[in-house]
A protein has these predicted regions:
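C-terminal catalytic histidine-bearing segment of alpha/beta-hydrolase fold enzymes
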Residues: 68, 229-233, 237-278
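Alpha/beta-hydrolase active-site loop
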Residues: 79-119
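Short beta-strand element of the alpha/beta-hydrolase
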Residues: 26-35
Length: 278
């Protein structure tokens, strides 16, 4: 049985947990990002699976999370922040999530640079994965970082601008919020522009021929499968010569949660596409 090491450290100002085979040398490296309000420990279960297969998994504390918890995020969550929108809409928190995604994706890029000199890993074989907010980060990183060679996004979606605009429209339909949202139209336009600039959706067309796995829960209302199915439909003809490198797994009777079969899917995906093992 392979011996696994677990190391908690900080690299490039990012708190991480490294889960690796004890004798790791030139292994693929997979970065894992947790969900909103979570922390790096959430990736350890998957990290063990990957390490047992011969990969190194780096579980990241997202920006403003875990060991770098930010009081600005705490204020948004506990009601003490200065909100742009009515607090009950959740729109300020939802917007901040996009900033966290971008900053964390940029952190992953810096981590790849720092791991380039680590003999345990091969930064020519980089994977990225995560769930919920971490799934958004996965899409963002895959779309914007050409060094990512394989990606697996769980219970999330790639269409950040479309979803933001849909949520704004839905919130505006409530009479009790309509006037307040209308009064900050300029701020909404600025926030929409920020999200549009980072949105991975269109850029994911250029991810081909690199492998992309998308996992959804059929009953998930936090991350509706609609947006992911739409991307899958658009990418299928692009991946026509290598259909095995694109996959959408929708789990019946599953809402916004990560299950062990999902983790198994991710492990198999990276085993196949980073290690070259069927």
């Amino acid at each position: 049985m392979n011996q696994i090491t677990v190391e908690t450290t900080t690299i490039a100002d990012v708190p991480i947990i490294i889960v690796a085979p004890e004798d790791a040398e030139g292994c693929p490296i997979v970065f894992h990002v947790h969900g909103f309000t979570g922390n790096k420990k959430a990736g350890v279960a998957l990290g063990y699976r990957l390490a047992m297969e011969g990969m190194v998994c780096v579980c990241v504390d997202a920006y403003m999370h875990g060991d770098r918890l930010d009081p600005r995020l705490t204020a948004l969550l506990d009601g003490s922040a200065d909100y742009v929108y009515p607090r009950d809409t959740g729109l300020d928190i939802y917007f901040e999530l996009h900033n966290i995604v971008k900053q964390t994706g940029d952190d992953v890029e810096r981590l790849i640079d720092r791991f380039a000199g680590d003999p345990r890993v091969d930064t020519g074989r980089v994977g990225v994965t995560g769930y919920s907010m971490g799934g958004f980060t996965t899409y963002y990183t895959a779309a914007h970082n050409p060094r990512v060679q394989a990606a697996a996004a769980l219970i999330s979606f790639p269409a950040l601008t479309e979803r933001w605009e849909d949520v704004i429209a839905e919130s505006s339909s409530y009479e009790k919020w309509a006037d307040a949202i209308a009064s900050v139209e300029a701020e909404t336009a600025e926030r929409t522009a920020f999200i549009r600039a980072m949105d991975p959706y269109a850029k994911l067309r250029d991810f081909y021929p690199r492998p992309l796995l998308m996992i959804q829960g059929d009953l998930d209302t936090d991350a509706p499968k609609f947006y992911t199915v739409k991307l899958y439909r658009e990418l299928k003809p692009i991946y026509a010569e290598h259909p095995e490198r694109l996959a959408l797994h929708v789990y019946d009777h599953i809402a916004h949660q990560v299950t062990n079969p999902m983790r198994d899917d991710v492990s198999e995906w990276f085993k196949q596409h980073l290690l070259g093992k069927a």
